[in-house]
């Protein structure tokens, strides 16, 4: 069972990661139950309407877990569903795993005057109860270990290279070179750094969010498309000349892999996430000057971007996730990697 507060119709890397993982686990022969806001009464998040917050989910979460009786339970998010599932597991002495997808301390700080230290304390308390907390990159792992997290395991991300692949540049008729941003248009994504950077050509914003109206009014020369999905998203991305990733707070940045799979180099700041995904001078350019990084990325070989991305399949990502799972009961008979107890964690990449 995978419990997540992030699910469709949200459009982000967390949802895409969990959807792909669930699909591949099914291909491996597992019966997967996703517990999502679609199963509950919910309200729109006041600051982000597309995010649904489940209302008073405790009893239904408990019933869902009892009815499904999972061999392994993974809590993917720290929202109402994740909190309810964690509470149930602790009360029933069930073992579980979690994953760290979002830098909530930085996200919250960008919106509200909440001390970062307090947010990390809350996250440490949440994830510390799990047998393993899965993280996507080594730099994130190092950062969390420095903040006292001790139960960390590696869970790399993947990309659908059949969907995201090189395509015709003629798909977009904007003046060249085209620099594209793909993702939520929100304050924590630092989109304005992309829109402010000097650029001779076109800027394309593929996505939507609470900051779109303000930024579209401030930067009328940029093209805002709103959300694009699946083949249409891949076609837009493949037609760009460079993808710019301005975020300073992402734990990974799945769109970086998607751009590389399309043969499009990525420009980003040298921060956690990009430094783990982008090979500077090969698949993209890292620089504290975002415009300089974007201009340098234009000189890179698209074939090298594609070649690096095809090594990152979702099948390998799902296998790594599977290997990190633990049996809910310490004496439970379980198959394959789920039989592994916490003492064998080094084999699954658990930090010390």
Protein language model regions, located:
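Short alpha-helical donor nucleotide-sugar binding micro-motif in glycosyltransferases
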Residues: 65, 127, 235-240, 321
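Nucleotide-sugar donor phosphate/pyrophosphate-binding loop at the beta->alpha transition
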Residues: 95-97, 106-125
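Conserved donor-binding/catalytic core segment of Leloir-type glycosyltransferases
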Residues: 168-204
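Nucleotide-activated donor-binding/catalytic signature segment of Leloir-type glycosyltransferases, i.e.
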Residues: 212-231
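Aromatic "clamp/platform" in nucleotide-sugar-dependent glycosyltransferases that forms part
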Residues: 248
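Short hydrophobic beta-strand element within catalytic cores of glycosyltransferases
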Residues: 261, 265-268, 278
């Amino acid at each position: 069972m995978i419990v997540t507060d992030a699910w469709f119709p949200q459009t982000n890397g967390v949802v895409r990661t969990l959807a792909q993982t669930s699909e591949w686990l099914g291909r491996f022969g597992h019966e997967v139950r996703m517990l999502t806001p679609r199963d509950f009464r919910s309200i729109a998040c006041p600051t982000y309407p597309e995010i649904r917050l489940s209302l008073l989910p405790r009893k239904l979460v408990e019933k869902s877990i009892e009815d499904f009786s999972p061999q392994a339970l993974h809590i993917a998010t720290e929202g109402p569903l994740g909190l309810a599932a964690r509470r149930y597991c602790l009360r029933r002495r069930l073992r579980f795993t979690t994953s760290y997808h979002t830098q909530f301390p930085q996200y919250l700080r960008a919106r509200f005057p909440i001390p970062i230290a307090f947010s990390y304390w809350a996250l440490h308390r949440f994830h510390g109860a799990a047998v393993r907390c899965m993280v996507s990159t080594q730099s994130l792992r190092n950062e969390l270990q420095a903040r006292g997290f001790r139960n960390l395991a590696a869970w790399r991300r993947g990309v659908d290279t059949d969907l995201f692949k090189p395509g015709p540049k003629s798909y977009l008729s904007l003046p060249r070179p085209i620099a594209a941003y793909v993702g939520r248009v929100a304050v924590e994504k630092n989109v304005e750094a992309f829109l402010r950077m000097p650029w001779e050509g076109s800027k394309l914003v593929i996505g939507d969010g609470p900051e779109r109206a303000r930024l579209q009014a401030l930067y009328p020369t940029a093209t805002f498309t709103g959300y694009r999905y699946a083949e249409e998203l891949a076609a837009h991305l493949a037609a760009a000349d460079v993808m710019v990733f301005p975020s300073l707070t992402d734990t990974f940045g799945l769109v970086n892999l998607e751009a590389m799979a399309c043969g499009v180099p990525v420009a980003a700041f040298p921060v956690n996430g990009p430094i783990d995904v982008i090979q500077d001078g090969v698949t993209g350019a890292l620089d504290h000057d975002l415009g300089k990084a974007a201009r340098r990325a234009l000189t890179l070989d698209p074939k090298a971007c594609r070649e690096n991305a095809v090594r990152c399949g979702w099948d390998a990502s799902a296998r790594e996730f599977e290997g990190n799972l633990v049996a809910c009961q310490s004496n439970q008979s379980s198959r394959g990697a789920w039989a592994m107890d916490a003492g064998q964690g080094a084999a699954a990449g658990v930090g010390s």
